[in-house]
Amino acid sequence: MKPWLCLVFFTSAFLIWHAEAEFFTSIGQMTDLIYAEKDLVQSLKEYIRAEETKLSQIKSWAEKMDVLTSKSTSDPEGYLAHPVNAYKLVKRLNTDWLELENLVLQDTTNGFITNLTIQRQFFPTEEDETGAAKALMRLQDTYKLDPETLSRGNLPGTKYRSSLTVSDCFGMGKTAYNDGDYYHTVLWMEQALKQHDEGEDTTVSKVEILDYLSYAVFQFGDLHRAMELTRRLISLDSTHERAGSNLRYFEKLLEKEREKPSNKTVATTEPVVQSGAYERPLDYLPERDIYEALCRGEGVKMTPRRQKRLFCRYHDGNRNPHLLIAPFKEEDEWDSPHIVRYYDVMSDEEIEKIKQLAKPKLARATVRDPKTGVLTVASYRVSKSSWLEEDDDPVVAKVNQRMQQITGLTVKTAELLQVANYGMGGQYEPHFDFSRRPFDSTLKSEGNRLATFLNYMSDVEAGGATVFPDFGAAIWPKKGTAVFWYNLFRSGEGDYRTRHAACPVLVGCKWVSNKWFHERGNEFLRPCGRTEVD
């Protein structure tokens, strides 16, 4: 089939891009899945057309034979008295019915199945589905979205409306359950049950939902509600062995509670805990609440007094000859530590070229293990990144040179240009750009990361801010702009105030590129100050 030939060509390109999975970590790479699915739909249509043609031929044959046999069976001997009819009967049974048999046995599925088999090896994996579900939960927590809001697709800045079915909500709950996350299990199983009760058509049964929900509720110590849900389950399926066993166990626990003198009254009058009454478990991140509040635009400590100390100006890079005629617009984002934003740093054409160069090289972004120093993937950094060299394209050298002119620092000892694309709920939780390991082998030749130059290569419809929990700043992405700050004091000591985070992307696709300038080569470009904190 022709679609199969087209697909082989498409898949060869798909293979180059997606030798590594983890689609959920990069929206840029997930866009290819859209085209892959469209190609499969086209292949499916071809299969349907072939099946319809085949059935049409069979139907035509059946109708013709129905008329003929009605005539022949009404007077068999009279019919066969005509020698032509006798011949045609023998011919039909020996030849024509054999041809029909071959038509019926003709396999039109081969092309579609071949397509599907080829494509499937590049499909998202179980890990991708789990990662995507956790991304939605991360957005739910960070931006305080209830399951109803997410399920109905009521998100700010969205161009396309999309909703979650009972099956989708059930899948979210199962992912949380399998991860031992009973908080989100309860939230999503309750949403699945709510939509089921509203009459939504689904293949998921209430029994399945109640089975997970009752156990998750029990894990929160809500014995009364666990019993209520289990009884509801048994009323729907009295043969459910596990539910019956659980109910007997719950009743024994309740009886023990009632036998305790101090709990005698409470046990018989305690009301059923309502939906949403369960608290989110404590997190490993100490500044979680501050970080998430800043991501929502809350808790930003931009006072009128501080605002008065922030200015806009034209920046010529300390009278850099290249910038005297065309200086950059510079805006103070924060006073201490000093964070500035530059406008029109990269053109749309340069941004598209950088993205084009980066896409084939995108790989899951890593972090350095604080104990071993080894680079590894981490759940708190969800994005894909690649590194571009000046030899890759003249535009890379041009952008590097521009950052050098703006900052007055040398790029000779700086790291390669890193390009990052954030996936579903893409984020990088609070971290330092500089190394806090004094004997880090990576610091021996080039020194520590002196400064960060961060280019925003896309607008983001919602979320995706760069936040600094220590002093309460939030900087929102704006395509073509860049922000710059020093990670180290002039003494070389780390400025711990610069601990920052990339907030989860709620709606949109976030592209950034950054350059980390190192200490070596900048000793005289940014000399030591008089004190350790200059």
Curated annotation (Swiss-Prot):
Domain Fe2OG dioxygenase: 413-519
Primary role: Catalyzes the post-translational formation of 4-hydroxyproline in -Xaa-Pro-Gly- sequences in collagens and other proteins.
Residues listed as glycosylation sites in the UniProt record: 115, 263
Keywords carried by this UniProt record: Dioxygenase, Endoplasmic reticulum, Glycoprotein, Iron, Metal-binding, Oxidoreductase, Signal, TPR repeat, Vitamin C
Keyword Transmembrane helix among record annotations: no
Subcellular location: Endoplasmic reticulum lumen
InterPro entries: Oxoglu/Fe-dep_dioxygenase_dom, P4HA-like, Pro_4_hyd_alph, Pro_4_hyd_alph_FE2OG_OXY, Pro_4_hyd_alph_N, TPR-like_helical_dom_sf
SMART domains: P4Hc (SM00702)
Superkingdom: Eukaryota
Essential cofactor(s): Fe(2+); L-ascorbate
Name by which UniProt lists this protein: Prolyl 4-hydroxylase subunit alpha-2
Keyword Transmembrane helix: no
Protein residues bound to 2-oxoglutarate: 510
GO molecular function: iron ion binding; L-ascorbic acid binding; procollagen-proline 4-dioxygenase activity
Cofactor binding summary note: Binds 1 Fe(2+) ion per subunit.
Stretch forming the signal peptide: 1-21
TPR repeat coordinates: 207-240
Subunit (UniProt): Heterotetramer of two alpha-2 chains and two beta chains (the beta chain is the multi-functional PDI).
GO CC terms of this entry: endoplasmic reticulum; endoplasmic reticulum lumen
Source lineage: Eukaryota, Metazoa, Chordata, Craniata, Vertebrata
Coarse class of the protein's main subcellular location: endoplasmic reticulum
Ligand binding (Fe cation): 431, 433, 500
Family indicated by similarity: Belongs to the P4HA family.
EC number: 1.14.11.2
Catalytic activity: L-prolyl-[collagen] + 2-oxoglutarate + O2 = trans-4-hydroxy-L-prolyl-[collagen] + succinate + CO2
SS bonds (residue pairs): none
